[in-house]
């Protein structure tokens, strides 16, 4: 009788010690409501994304949650970089969270985004940023700060073309040009 009681208590303890950590999991809550769950969740992971013919992106993140059927991944505490065929860094950066198109390499980033265009020596800081690798464009809504050798600017609704090096604000709040 005592063995059965001990076994019952051990089973209860085992099940009560397991919990689902919904607060720290980066899972698309709207997808979970539809019954769509991630394929895999990686912690402290490195992952390469990119198509043939484009410079792949090395992604390092505290967590990466993959939804391979839908072709995207959610990230948390991430850094990223891309190198060209000569192994020169094209761009790099960091963000608190992101949504990555794993079929291509487009990224939606938010939470203290820092994006560095290494070839042009420019750093962009924004709360959110969209990187479209197909068009080689950057879009950041809201307040954005840009710093380079040419100067420092802050403004709103930033758009950039990485092919041509043309970067514009819809409204400049303040700026400083260096004429050297």
Give the positions of each predicted feature.
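Mature-chain termini and adjacent capping regions
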Residues: 1-180
């Amino acid at each position: 009788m005592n063995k059965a009681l001990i076994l019952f208590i051990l089973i209860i303890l085992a099940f009560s010690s397991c919990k689902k950590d919904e607060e720290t999991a980066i899972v698309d809550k709207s997808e979970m409501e539809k019954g769509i769950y991630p394929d895999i969740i990686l912690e402290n992971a490195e992952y390469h994304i990119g198509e043939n013919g484009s410079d792949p992106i090395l992604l390092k993140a505290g967590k990466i949650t993959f939804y391979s059927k839908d072709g995207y991944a959610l990230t948390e505490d991430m850094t990223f970089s891309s190198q060209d065929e000569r192994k020169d860094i094209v761009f790099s950066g960091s963000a608190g969270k992101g949504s990555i198109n794993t079929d291509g390499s487009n990224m939606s980033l938010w939470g203290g985004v820092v994006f560095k265009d290494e070839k042009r020596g420019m750093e962009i800081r924004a709360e959110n940023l969209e990187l479209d690798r197909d068009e080689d464009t950057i879009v950041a809504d809201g307040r954005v700060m840009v710093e380079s050798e040419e100067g420092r600017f802050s403004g709103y609704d930033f758009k950039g073309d990485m092919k041509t090096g043309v970067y514009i604000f819809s409204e400049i709040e303040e700026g400083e040009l260096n004429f050297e």
